[in-house]
């Protein structure tokens, strides 16, 4: 997961610094175990952003309050990065790793378009015809979710540098393209 990286600092696979806290520690521990693979096993470590599907998944959860109230809720202040990837690009990237045996090491699976949480929420609100956008203070999420709120209130600014260098082309490179291709009737269930 991209939670490996420090919050609010632009990072890519060449970044040597890791973040602080539970998520970064968990990612580090997973990767440390993966690196124990015996040689000559080819190891590709993938760090995912939020995986979004035009058919539901995490997007259904994010849309629940919007559908109920017609209000798009920005997690305050909204400036935190929101690293994401379309599930179709994620699947294509996995096939890309399998087909290109020279690839190894760490790869960030995030769209090339970096967006803030506010930008994402406003685009979602526009696509789903929200009446308004409301900024919900981070403290509300901290009270509701405790330390788990950090998944929502802090974000990592992550680039897929190595994936792009390897010649991978994203079919859904922007959040606007994601919402254009979303089957709203499926996600609205």
Q: Which residue ranges define each predicted feature?
A:
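Conserved Rossmann-fold NAD(P)-dependent oxidoreductase catalytic core, especially the SDR/UDP-sugar
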Residues: 1-20
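Glycine/proline-rich active-site loop of Rossmann-fold NAD(P)-dependent oxidoreductases
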Residues: 7, 28, 40-41, 52-61, ...
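Glycine-rich "substrate-gating" loop/helix at the edge of Rossmann-like oxidoreductase active sites
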Residues: 17-23, 49-56, 76-87
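Active-site Tyr-X1-5-Lys
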Residues: 18-47
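Alpha-helical substrate-binding/gating segment
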Residues: 35, 63-72, 79-114
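Mid/C-terminal beta-alpha module of Rossmann-like enzyme folds, strongest
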Residues: 97-147, 180-189
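C-terminal amphipathic/interface module of NAD(P)-dependent oxidoreductases
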Residues: 150-189
């Amino acid at each position: 997961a991209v939670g490996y990286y420090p919050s609010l600092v632009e990072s890519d696979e060449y970044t040597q610094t890791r973040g602080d806290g539970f998520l970064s520690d968990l990612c580090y521990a997973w990767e440390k175990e993966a690196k124990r693979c015996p040689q000559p096993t080819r190891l590709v470590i993938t760090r995912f952003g939020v995986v979004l599907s035009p058919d539901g998944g995490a997007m259904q959860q994010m849309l629940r309050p919007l559908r109920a109230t017609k209000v798009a809720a920005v997690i305050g202040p909204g400036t935190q990065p929101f690293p994401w990837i379309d599930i179709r690009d994620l699947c294509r990237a996995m096939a890309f790793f399998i087909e290109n045996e020279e690839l190894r090491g760490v790869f960030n699976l995030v769209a090339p378009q970096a967006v803030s949480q506010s930008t994402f929420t406003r685009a979602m609100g526009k696509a789903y015809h929200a009446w308004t956008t409301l900024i919900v203070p981070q403290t509300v999420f901290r009270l509701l979710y405790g330390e788990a709120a950090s998944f929502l209130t802090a974000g990592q600014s992550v680039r897929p540098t190595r994936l792009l260098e390897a010649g991978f082309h994203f079919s859904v490179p922007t959040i606007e393209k994601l919402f254009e291709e979303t089957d709203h009737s499926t996600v609205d269930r």
